[in-house]
Amino acid sequence: MPSSTSPDQGDDLETCILRFSDLDLKDMSLINPSSSLKAELDGSTKKKYSFAKKKAFALFVKTKEVPTKRSFECKEKLWKCCQQLFTDQTSIHRHVATQHADEIYHQTASILKQLAVTLSTSKSLSSADEKNPLKECLPHSHDVSAWLPDISCFNPDELISGQGSEEGEVLLYYCYRDLEDPQWICAWQTALCQQLHLTGKIRIAAEGINGTVGGSKLATRLYVEVMLSFPLFKDDLCKDDFKTSKGGAHCFPELRVGVFEEIVPMGISPKKISYKKPGIHLSPGEFHKEVEKFLSQANQEQSDTILLDCRNFYESKIGRFQGCLAPDIRKFSYFPSYVDKNLELFREKRVLMYCTGGIRCERGSAYLKAKGVCKEVFQLKGGIHKYLEEFPDGFYKGKLFVFDERYALSYNSDVVSECSYCGARWDQYKLCSTPQCHQLVLTCPACQGQGFTACCVTCQDKGSRKVSGPMQDSFKEECECTARRPRIPRELLQHVRQPVSPEPGPDAEEDGPVLV
């Protein structure tokens, strides 16, 4: 049975360093959980690895806690994970141990990596008498409760109510800045979101924080206030960095807070491609003028400018800037390979990059700049989110895809995509109806009425077989649409720009995107 160690125990980084002062954390092979390797480790190293794993386990369980109205009055705890509700600590521990071993392993690795960084720099920091902003403000304690808002003046129902689509709100934000102790930030963010009854996803790394959370407007307002007053972020974040949209806690199945190597998964170490060397930021107004100039050119294929969509194909499929180059890639981690494979396309070009909220462009533009082939690289500050706030009827047509249960936000009436079955204009995604398939499909009401609710012929056939019972667990995704899609497409040197009002046609695509 996993340890029930409280996540608060051992969170003080100095305590960890004192206990593990002789551990060579640079040798990351030590964290391999294989039994054969464990047998080769000496007792001291086993003990140290065990401590890190217990901490990772406790932090993971902590992120699965869900607030209840009674939690304000008593110490009752509930946990929600994988769409299941757990009422006792034993059951949630058993579930995490059996179903989330990989996540615990990666969290353990992250803890050890962060300790390695701290250990390697602690002596130099001490000799230089450099100050850590967090330690300066918290000289006596790293207790996260010191940085939680006072909500005693609010009725608990005020934080919970108003979470519906009309009254609630979803925040989207990121902040690139060096963080010395991501694990502490993780524990603090978990406690903060639980206190405010927020759900969502928050990624934390040594390079910063990236979050999207939903709840009542009171809860999101308090969250922003806390973030703007926190010592590590107050000089890097402003209120305008938080993009807002209608929604609430219901937009996310649960709260997920974790520590990763990157705050957006590009697949390249931040040490190799840093956020500190991005493309030039353009305000929505400046970007609008650049796009207007680009579209006014008689022959855009011969232009020295490329309008580049940094998102995945299923995002640009339902909304995009007119004349953009929208890579047919499924994940942002494919973007570097896409650039490498199409490097000549960008040679001597001015590149205007954009994404949903701006975060992918930060390191994406840094990667493109590092190739040394572009004239200039620009990025849309605040992303499509901020552009549409200022120009709802501008050059962006269609819907804005979002990574939550809303799937898309609408700022204009344009429909730029079509039903995968009949070609009628349609842009409302639904999950493929086949069990265990996590792809999205565009199928209009008429086609849905005829039973066409899967992402491809293979999945449609699976649905008709209605596999259930023990066999369902081994009924793996085998989508034709994914199998036939090139992982990294090669563009023509004179790329075909994307239209904004495609005519319906019989040759509709049958491929639906994977929701990641």
UniProtKB/Swiss-Prot annotation:
InterPro entries xref list? Rhodanese-like_dom, Rhodanese-like_dom_sf, Rhodanese_C, TrhO, TRHO_N
Q: Does the keyword Calcium feature in the UniProt annotation? A: no
Protein origin, superkingdom: Eukaryota
| Modification type Phosphoserine: residues | 269
Active-site residues are: 355
Domain Rhodanese, by residue range, is 301-396
Please give the residue ranges the record annotates as the region Disordered: 490-516
Q: Name one Pfam family in it.
A: Rhodanese
Instruction: Detail the disulphide connectivity of this chain as listed in its UniProt entry.
Output: none
Q: Where is the sequence biased in composition, kind Acidic residues?
A: 506-516
Keywords, comma-separated and alphabetical? Phosphoprotein
This chain belongs to the protein called Thiosulfate sulfurtransferase/rhodanese-like domain-containing protein 2
The organism's taxonomy opens as: Eukaryota, Metazoa, Chordata, Craniata, Vertebrata
